[in-house]
Structures are given as structure tokens and as C-alpha cells.
């Protein structure tokens, strides 16, 4: 572990005599602080990933009125993380990632007349879906040992931004909608050194949705949606092919809801509302990273 990197774990800085003795004693066992280099390498890294995101969106409207989007799209992400000492505090953890998923999904819905009656209950078309997710995390790692296994837990606070473009405008009865929201929350990440080169990570977080909205192309107003809790969980593996070259695989599951909007004017003499909806996204990614 290079001292100039200033990354620390349990024995990372000058401490009182009792603390030094504890660190020296820990170093005599297989689960020593130094042995946690694998997690430090995994957490001090920049990476690029590619994979698949499965979208499942549906609206709760009423009997005979279904409105949903479902399908798989190509996903790409870029991210970076670091675990180090900062301002005299050891094992601070920071990460940031941007992910974009784009592709065609299947719309299942209905057509209605001017008075709102259903004129075609099962209408199918193709939607171009583009989702953008930005996630930032800040926390502190607490190293521990599970028998002879090296591990650590990282409680953190988080911010995320979600943007979904729902574009079926190529269809004669299609539309163009853009959904957006922010999430402020926190979570807990657990990491385990499976081998000196392989690190497994489990992560779960939840947060409060803020500023959710939907913009409809051609409308003179934006629909203000109801804010609901957001839950995200995931699992990942990071393998050090070489000291600085890593490969990774991740899975993430997320669920959120939008509450019904107020009746909103979309054109002179015409108003509408956005119904309650639910979204479940599942994302599988593989990629490469550079550990520093």
C-alpha cells in the first residue's frame, strides 16, 4: 500500500499507544488491516460498463384502461469511486455514476374518444425509451472481520436524479412525454473480500422523491406528480485481473411510484391529469475499470 495514496483503514494513521498496539496485534492474523487492500483497490477506481436494462412501467387508471411500457434497452455507464483519508478522517467513501439506457419498448394501452370513452381497449405501439440516472454517494467505511474474512460496511447519504423520455410520436396516436425526479436518501453497502482479487458488494438504499414532474410535448403546462419513496438494491463483483486493471459485473433493482397529478390544462379548452404509476427497472452490467 503506497503511503502517498493517503488511503487508510483501521490502522491508517498515528494513534495513541493503545491503538498502535491493537493494530500491531491485528497484523499478526490473516484478517489484518493490510489484507484489506482488495477492497481499497475496488473502491479507488474509475470504470465503464455496458449491459441491459429492463423497463416495466404501468399506470393505475381504472377498469378497462391499461397503460404500460415494457422491454429491454441497451445501457451504458461511467463511474468513479474513492475510499481515503480526508480532513483527518480515515476511510471516507465517495462515488458518482452516470447511466444511460436507450432502445425500443412495447406500449400496451387503449384509445379513447373525445368524451373519454374507450374506443379501442387493446392498442399496441412501439416507444423509444431513454432513461438517464445520476447517482452520488458519500459515506464512511468501517472495516471488520467475519471469521477469517475481511469485510467492511459503508453507511452513506445519497443523491440521485432520474430522467425518462417516453417517445411514441412516430405512431399516429403516439405522444412524447418526459418524466423527471430527484431523490435524497441514504443506504448501506457491505463488502467482502472473497479472495485477494475478488470483492463482492451488496448495496441497498432508500430515499424521498423530490420535484417529480411530467412534461407533455405540445402542452402549455407541466404536470406536477405526487412524490413517493424510492427503493434501490444491488449486487456486484469486482475482480482484479492485474493491480490496476479490473473487470466487474453488477445487478440493480429499483422501484418507484408517481402519484396522480392535479387536473392540468394542456391546451385552450382541454385539460388532463397524469394517473398514479409504478416503475420497476432491472439493470445487468459488465465492464472494466482502472484502479488507482
Briefly describe each language-model feature range.
Residues 222-292:
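Predominantly the C-terminal beta-signal and adjacent terminal strand-loop region
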Residues 76-84, 134-142, 157-159, 186-192, ...:
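Residues on the lipid-exposed face of transmembrane beta-strands in outer-membrane beta-barrel proteins
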Residues 46-54, 94-102, 155-161, 190, ...:
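Transmembrane beta-barrel strands of outer-membrane/channel proteins
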Residues 99-187:
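Outer-membrane pore/translocation modules
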Residues 58-70, 117-127, 169-177, 213-226, ...:
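Extracellular loop and loop/strand-boundary signature of outer-membrane beta-barrel proteins
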Residues 34-108, 278, 283-285, 289-292:
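Short glycine/proline- and aromatic-enriched beta-strand/turn motifs that initiate or cap beta-hairpins
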Residues 42-44, 70-76, 126-134, 151, ...:
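Residues that define the transmembrane beta-barrel architecture of outer-membrane proteins
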Residues 35-44, 83-94, 142-153, 194-200, ...:
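Short loop/turn motifs that connect adjacent beta-strands in outer-membrane beta-barrel proteins
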Amino acid at each position: 500500500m503506497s503511503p502517498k495514496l493517503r488511503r487508510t483503514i483501521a490502522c491508517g494513521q498515528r494513534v495513541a499507544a493503545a491503538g498502535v498496539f491493537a493494530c500491531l496485534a491485528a497484523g499478526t492474523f490473516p484478517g489484518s488491516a493490510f489484507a484489506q487492500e482488495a477492497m481499497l483497490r475496488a473502491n479507488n477506481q474509475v470504470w465503464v460498463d455496458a449491459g441491459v436494462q429492463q423497463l416495466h412501467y404501468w399506470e393505475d387508471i381504472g377498469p378497462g384502461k391499461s397503460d404500460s411500457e415494457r422491454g429491454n434497452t441497451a445501457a451504458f455507464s461511467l463511474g468513479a469511486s474513492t475510499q481515503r483519508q480526508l480532513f483527518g478522517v480515515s476511510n471516507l467513501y465517495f462515488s458518482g455514476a452516470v447511466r444511460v439506457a436507450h432502445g425500443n419498448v412495447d406500449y400496451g394501452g387503449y384509445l379513447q374518444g373525445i368524451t373519454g370513452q374507450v374506443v379501442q381497449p387493446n392498442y399496441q405501439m412501439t416507444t423509444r425509451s431513454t432513461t438517464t440516472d445520476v447517482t452520488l454517494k458519500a459515506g464512511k467505511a468501517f472495516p471488520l472481520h467475519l471469521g477469517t474474512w475481511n469485510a467492511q460496511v459503508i453507511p452513506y447519504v445519497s443523491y440521485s436524479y432520474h430522467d425518462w423520455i417516453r417517445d411514441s410520436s412516430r405512431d399516429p396516436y403516439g405522444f412524447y412525454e418526459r418524466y423527471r425526479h430527484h431523490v435524497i436518501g441514504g443506504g448501506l453497502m457491505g463488502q467482502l473480500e472473497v479472495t485477494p482479487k475478488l470483492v463482492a458488494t451488496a448495496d441497498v438504499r432508500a430515499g424521498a422523491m423530490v420535484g417529480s414532474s411530467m412534461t407533455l410535448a405540445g402542452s402549455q403546462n407541466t404536470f406536477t406528480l405526487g412524490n413517493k419513496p424510492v427503493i434501490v438494491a444491488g449486487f456486484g463483483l469486482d475482480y482484479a485481473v492485474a493491480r490496476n486493471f479490473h473487470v466487474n459485473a453488477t445487478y440493480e433493482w429499483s422501484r418507484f411510484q408517481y402519484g396522480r397529478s392535479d387536473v392540468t390544462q394542456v391546451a385552450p379548452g382541454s385539460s388532463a391529469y397524469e394517473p398514479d404509476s409504478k416503475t420497476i427497472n432491472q439493470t445487468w452490467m459488465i465492464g472494466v475499470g482502472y484502479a488507482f
